[in-house]
Amino acid sequence: MNNKMTKIGKRFVGKVAIITASTQGIGFGIALRLGLEGASVVISSRKQNNVDDAVEKLKVQGIDAFGVVCHVSNAQQRKNLIDQTVQKYGKIDVVVSNAAVNPTVDNILDTKESVLDKLWEINVKASILLLKDASPYLTEGSSVVFVSSIAAFGPQASMAMYGVTKTALLGLTKALAVEMAPKTRVNGIAPGFVPTHFADFITNNDTVRKAIEERTVLNRLGSTDDMGAAAAFLASDDAAYITGETLVVAGGMPSRL
């Protein structure tokens, strides 16, 4: 844990947060930040051993952490995630929808229909269905944070269709902000490039990594701590008058539609 993480506040004491796909990478970074700020965090991923390992890492930090196996495309597992959270904590204050896949580097018109379906199902549809399950238990003043991507603003060749699904989350954020107001705020973050397992096919290439760094104003890649801080801000009462917005967290990389 770096020095910045020792100076954080306690904005989520008494709050309950669900974060999907949160046993590593950006999802884990968000769970860690929310937990360090006092939230009871419910983490999830597809594999039990990953869930168990991540829960233990959070508990070592003094965080109240609970883990549930959940593949977000599985309706029963989504429902179980919500049901177990409510059974244990009685409410939901924050939902962070982070699960995503990028199974192809093909051009959009060369992408198989089954892959198109998978991208839509995991990256967009599952977020909607998760909120349908969670919404009856969301508290007054609750918050939803979608994890979009810098690719939403300019899909690149190696991740074109992935970028399109992340663009869809920008619209979903706007639409649900209206639909769920005033009880629940809905926002998103659009991370830049972060060296995680999900992005290692890009960030592990030194030439590509350097080129990405040079596209940022800050001349560096992002970190999971950066993403955790941004998501925590939007989920907190510090952002009480912000809804329907997507915060770009990309070191100044060009990012507007």
Predicted region positions:
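Short C-terminal tail/terminal secondary-structure segment
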Residues: 2-8, 105, 154, 232, ...
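Conserved glycine-rich cofactor-binding loop
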Residues: 16, 23-25
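Active-site helix of classical SDR
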Residues: 131, 165, 173
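Alpha-helical segment proximal to the catalytic Tyr-Lys
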Residues: 136, 177-182, 240
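Residue(s) in the substrate-gating loop at a strand-loop-helix junction
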Residues: 149
